[in-house]
């Protein structure tokens, strides 16, 4: 029993092992049978495909044969995806048709058609094509370089005809050595020759062939190096989904072949290829450029490694170790350094850049010129109204009454507008250097130049010789306004003048308050500081004709030009005006005499006193050598009329200017001033000669009414005793009767005055000197006149009416003046 128990497990184990072995053997056999069946199926499918291709070729050959036979028709229908393609092959140099040239068609880089040309160099091919696929046609022949033609269309063609021109190969120089073979091109420049070198052992000659029968061809593919080449180069790269085509720009291209007995020899191995490169800015020694070879199975250029750029004999060369002879090009990949750039393309880029730059520069110049013209036009247009306003103002000034009579029309606004348009610096054309007592008499040319400058000045033609006297004693005068008017030491009656002047300046503060209150009532603002020296004469020194008693005194004292018919009324509007560092009496608003009653003529106060100034050296005779007979200063006199309400002060300035211009050598006979209002010469001015030389003082007073000139007749009966001075000294309105002045006329056209005249010197010096009395020249009637002045200082006595005879005499005098005009007024 024990033995049986031991045998049962052993048998069981052996049975299991057998079962397992059988189970493994059955699947292996089945698998073998399955694998054998798959192989047979694949082989059967391949056989069927080959049979179909053979049948298709037979059909195509049959169709071609039928087309050659006239009148034959094809019974087979052409599929939609097939179109007819005719290829014409010729020689590019001789333009001859090439027969027996191989033509191949590649669709999507797969060869679909391969045929040869007939005797006419043409062949007709049915090409199966689908839209979106690439199409390449190549043609080649022995002795010619292969020519590819990539082509792609978006529409299905029905018929197409193309022509391919083949370049003939260039025979090369072959150098056979014991171990190497060197092939070079036949180029004139040896420095840039391409060369191919390989081992002699790589050449395998056929039987009965000698090495001397070997012929080499090395051709530089110039057609591939042109930018506008129709036969553009297309390269392909292999990736996961398939082939990817890229556009190439070759930098170097070569075709190397070896023939022996008319047959091409295959050389495979390490071949050293050296090609010259085009000079490019983005290519330098050390760069690696991809190498491309033409694949006859795909019909495209395929990348096969990289070559190195080196510099040899100052030239760049591309060296590459090729695996076989054939077609090789050096072309960088698109988007990398040196891709698609050569000298021609750079020249085109530079040309366009220069052209665009020139266009941009011209446009900028045109725009700048347009804006410049527009700016000038706008400036002229804006400046025309101001210029027209200034011209109208000057014409209005010229057309006004140019006599010395005063007008009370308020034109201060017109003057202000004109002054704003003019340069302020022209108004203060002070010649401090010329106003020097030590300076000698100037020349005649200088005097004429200064006079012409006065006449041609633009701003109101105000002759401003020197304003330096304003600042000489301004501090003293501002501290004591009566200091310049008080006499130094008077032996007789100095107190009358002092009392009179103190009474005239006593109410300065009251008048100043009245000035500020009535400033706006008369429609004018403060006077510009540039004109303060014109309107600031505190007193007017006028000389009467009854004081000229002897002819010896006449050349030293001539009357100034006086206002014409009418009197000036000075009321409380006349008060001193203090501005910064200029303080003198300024009458604000003279009122015409027609507004006053006749009783006001009794209110004239005439202070008679023989006054003289200390003799000081001055240069007032500078104009004596060049003064004309008829001094015409229409601009100066005109401004005295226009600048109302300060016409009386401007009249004093006109007199001062004429006195300055008329100083010169003394004349033996008394002369009068003739002022031409319109600039006419002296010969055209009508004047008359009145001989009034008598022994006694006459009551006649002849004056040129139109010219505004006072002419005093000299009297030989007695010497000049004193000058008659009019001083504004009362608070009540005072009237200066200019008719009371005894004036006369003479025939001469030039007035002779000298600086020794004390009254005139006082006027020209701006009133800064002191008034002195000469007791030696006092007349018998002087005391009585002064006593009358003291007696009439009270307001009640000043209101008395003048005698009737005196008024009649004044009326008769004016009648005489009006009946005898000297010149016509245009």
Swiss-Prot record:
Bilayer topology term: Single-pass type I membrane protein
Positions carrying Phosphoserine: 794
Biased composition regions of type Basic and acidic residues, renumbered to the chain: 438-448, 774-786, 805-826
Entry keyword set: Glycoprotein, Membrane, Phosphoprotein, Signal, Transmembrane, Transmembrane helix
Compartments, record wording: Cytoplasmic granule; Membrane
Parts forming coiled coils: none
Family indicated by similarity: Belongs to the FAM171 family.
Protein's recorded name: Protein FAM171B
Taxonomic source organism: Homo sapiens (Human)
High-level lineage: Eukaryota, Metazoa, Chordata, Craniata, Vertebrata
